[in-house]
């Protein structure tokens, strides 16, 4: 079915190879992405679609604008959801990311810890232990290969995302939801409570136990302004408020 739907300049076999062996720095051909989406959408009769990561190239903007016509959902409202996240936030979320080798649950040694932490005497390092109910539990969570480089391997993708965001923001005739992941430290106390701010965690050994130290996580935004990063809940609230306005509900 996928081969019948595919129309592109790259051979079907090469496109499949790009899918199975893709790296974080390279994007799949647009035509192949559309074929994959069409194939999956055929199985989702009459459902609302939320497509994450489209567009990823400037030529995909036009595809996304007319995508509802391609899938015959002509009467459904469409919109762009644009989120502004400082590169420093992305960088640290990648650098401190750890994954359970058993269930693939993801956490962050600095920003999203588990309930169980252990200290390795030989390494002189703290480790998170997986506590997912889907997992047998107790596995030491490990960093992914290349994560120590942060945003370096995906620099070209980030630059492209910035270009696309600016292009999408300039479009007329399509509603846009604008979200911010961060707010300056100076303004944060005026509009947000402490429980809405992303905490930063560190650890200390004290009387044979591991003490968790928590404080607000501060970063520099892309303009060099000292800022805090919001947790997901206040960002989702902002999304729902704007969505209700667009849908007039």
Language-model-detected regions and their locations in the chain:
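Substrate-engagement module of ASCE P-loop NTPases
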Residues: 69-73, 165
